[in-house]
């Protein structure tokens, strides 16, 4: 086996306490996640992870939905603990009986251990069965008074790697207004007021990623002023988006055709933000004109 470490979080706890929100939060933090994992399959799954170069941060939901399989949880945890290449923690989500009953009434779902349909009986049985696991958990979170957003923030605070990159990803994209606004954009900026390289014959067939086009776009005084204001607007508000629990922020910059000005600006912005944040850069329409010409 590889000597590289796996960072494993076992997510467990009371049914209705927020495990679905929790596992989604781990996925947003960049973890490889699996919901409702039978305990007996965990060691074999971790062996497969060790043999690959895939994501070594893993979060698995293991709970009473496994029913009969759950009795193997102790032997599974012993196996994990004996493996020096695995660092693991247990996150236990809890809530008061009254709050859990209220949540089940609201969703109209049945409790996995309520054989006769009485939710409170199922909750009490589950609490008794999970008591030993709760006592060995490194993290116990009471979600009784927490909103989903607050739970996501709690998980981010406790399990992110301590950087902005772990909890907010920024998608910087360019586009052409003539092809429509991006439906998933959170912030949209229009750079059609800038001089257009399209009217420079030697630049027309190139894109904003080509050095001469990039320099043409960014060297104009209007570009310098606008870019400065753009950074001054975006950078201070990123922590606020992060605090609100947003995992992906899409910043879209548009020009007429999405080939020159918006591409150059998006590329420049992505490089600036990437010094402190996790950034993905994309250019939706930069080749759209060429593809249209080739099809005609």
Curated annotation (Swiss-Prot):
ATP binds at residues 13-20. InterPro entries: P-loop_NTPase, RapZ-like, RapZ-like_N, RapZ_C. SUPFAM superfamilies: P-loop containing nucleoside triphosphate hydrolases. The keyword Nucleotide-binding applies. Keywords: ATP-binding, GTP-binding, Nucleotide-binding. The keyword Nucleotide-binding applies. One of its GO terms (molecular function) is ATP binding. Gene3D superfamilies: P-loop containing nucleotide triphosphate hydrolases (3.40.50.300). GTP binds at residues 63-66. Displays ATPase and GTPase activities. PANTHER family: RNASE ADAPTER PROTEIN RAPZ. Belongs to the RapZ-like family. This is Nucleotide-binding protein M6_Spy0559. It comes from Streptococcus pyogenes serotype M6 (strain ATCC BAA-946 / MGAS10394). The lineage of its organism: Bacteria, Bacillati, Bacillota, Bacilli, Lactobacillales.
């Amino acid at each position: 086996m590889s000597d590289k470490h796996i960072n494993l979080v076992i997510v467990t706890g009371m049914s209705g306490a927020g495990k679905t929100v929790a596992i989604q939060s781990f996925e947003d933090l960049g973890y490889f996640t699996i919901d409702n994992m039978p305990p007996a399959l965990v060691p074999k799954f971790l062996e497969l992870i060790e043999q690959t170069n895939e994501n070594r941060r893993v979060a698995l939901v293991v709970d009473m939905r496994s029913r009969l399989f759950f009795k193997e949880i102790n032997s599974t945890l012993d196996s994990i603990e004996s493996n020096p290449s695995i660092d693991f923690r247990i996150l236990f989500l809890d809530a008061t009986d009254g709050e859990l009953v209220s949540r089940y009434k609201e969703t109209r779902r049945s409790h996995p251990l309520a054989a006769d349909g009485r939710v409170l009986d199922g909750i009490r049985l589950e609490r008794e069965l999970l008591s030993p696991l709760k006592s060995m958990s490194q993290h116990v979170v009471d979600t009784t008074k927490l909103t989903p957003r607050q739970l996501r923030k709690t998980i981010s605070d406790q399990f992110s790697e301590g950087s902005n990159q772990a909890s907010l990803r920024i998608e910087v994209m360019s586009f052409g207004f003539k092809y429509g606004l991006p439906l998933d954009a959170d912030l949209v900026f229009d750079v059609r007021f800038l001089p257009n390289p399209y009217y420079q014959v030697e630049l027309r067939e190139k894109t904003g990623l080509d050095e001469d086009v990039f320099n043409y776009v960014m060297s104009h005084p209007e570009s310098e002023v606008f870019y400065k204001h753009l950074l001054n607007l975006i950078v201070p508000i990123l922590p606020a988006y992060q605090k609100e629990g947003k995992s992906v922020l899409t910043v879209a910059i548009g020009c007429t055709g999405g080939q020159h000005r918006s591409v150059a600006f998006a590329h420049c912005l992505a490089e600036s933000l990437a010094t402190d944040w996790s950034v993905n850069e994309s250019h939706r329409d930069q080749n759209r004109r060429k593809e249209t010409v080739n099809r005609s």
